[in-house]
């Protein structure tokens, strides 16, 4: 069996285990897992840019904010999205976030490296400023409270039912993103990440490829925002702040950039560590920061890169003749 097939099988088994085990735990664990699943979609969307296209973005929280605020505003002001029309809100959230990414991308994709990073940072801060200052629409610093979850044949106020909804959309998102990165388009993105000049010489429109990837990542970020609004029950400028984008970036690096699943693993670990460490010490942020630093220093390929590092360090003993053949010839 090919290694890629084994990895897919492991992911499927892990997802099945989550779907079976989590609903049988307490409500706190279920809520924490649901939040991690929703945020994982944002992290995986960022990984399309970071791991597969080589574009580290600090503005991904803007798309989460678009989806979340759209959901909250429609639900509280117009009672829209609380029935079967919830699925329309999902579509609207994806499209609006993708549209915002299309606008941002016209500016950001023209830059590379640290300049791209700074432009996405600036655009993300603009989104935060709107959320913080536009009190009449966003509620300003107080945010918007969602008092009810949708009902469309099933009651999403039930934590188990809501968990399965978020889990299902997470699984679909993972499948779609996996299909994308394994497609010819996704392989072109990997080529652009490694040798953009060579891809240009081969006739690829590298700007367009990166622009499309930027828009797709924004759309999935909007989906994460729609789910996050109902998961958290409140939408505020905290969802759009810089630290949200940084968290997503660090989660992707912790799990392993360019793996998709690694981003989800990173999100689960960070959400779990936050809750656990915050009950032990008041300076839990520093402990979490130490985890990030150690990961970057000693696991630059993230947790998903551990098996490969083990394989590379494994020494297969050979006979003396093999060693002699490998030894350099000296005069």
What are these regions, as identified by a protein language model?
Residues 1-331:
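Transmembrane alpha-helices and adjacent helix-loop boundaries
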């Amino acid at each position: 069996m090919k290694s890629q097939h084994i990895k897919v099988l492991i992911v499927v088994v892990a997802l099945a285990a989550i779907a079976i085990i989590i609903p049988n735990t307490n409500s706190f664990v279920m809520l924490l897992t649901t939040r991690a699943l929703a945020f994982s979609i944002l992290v995986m969307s960022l990984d399309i840019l970071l791991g597969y296209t080589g574009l580290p973005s600090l503005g991904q929280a803007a798309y989460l904010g678009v989806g979340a605020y759209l959901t909250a505003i429609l639900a509280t002001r117009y009672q829209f999205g609380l029935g079967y029309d919830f699925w329309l809100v999902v579509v609207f959230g994806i499209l609006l976030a993708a549209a915002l990414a299309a606008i941002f991308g016209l500016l950001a994709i023209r830059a590379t490296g640290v300049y791209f990073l700074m432009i996405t940072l600036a655009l993300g801060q603009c989104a935060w400023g709107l959320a913080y200052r536009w009190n009449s629409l966003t509620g300003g610093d107080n945010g918007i409270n969602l008092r009810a979850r949708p009902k469309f044949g099933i009651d999403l106020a039930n934590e188990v039912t809501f968990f399965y909804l978020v889990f299902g959309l997470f699984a679909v998102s993972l499948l779609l993103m996996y299909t994308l990165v394994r497609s010819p388009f996704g392989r072109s993105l990997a080529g652009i990440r490694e040798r953009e000049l060579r891809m240009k010489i081969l006739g690829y429109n590298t700007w367009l490829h990166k622009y499309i990837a930027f828009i797709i990542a924004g759309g999935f970020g909007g989906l994460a925002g729609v789910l996050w609004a109902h998961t958290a029950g409140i939408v505020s400028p905290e969802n759009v702040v810089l630290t949200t984008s940084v968290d997503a970036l660090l989660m992707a690096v912790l799990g392993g950039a360019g793996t998709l699943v690694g981003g989800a693993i990173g999100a689960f670990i960070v959400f779990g560590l936050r809750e656990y460490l915050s009950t032990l010490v008041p300076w839990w942020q520093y402990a979490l920061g130490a985890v990030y630093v150690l990961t970057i220093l000693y696991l630059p390929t993230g947790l998903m890169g551990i098996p490969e590092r083990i394989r590379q360090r494994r020494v297969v003993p050979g006979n003396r003749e093999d060693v002699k053949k490998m030894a350099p010839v000296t005069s």
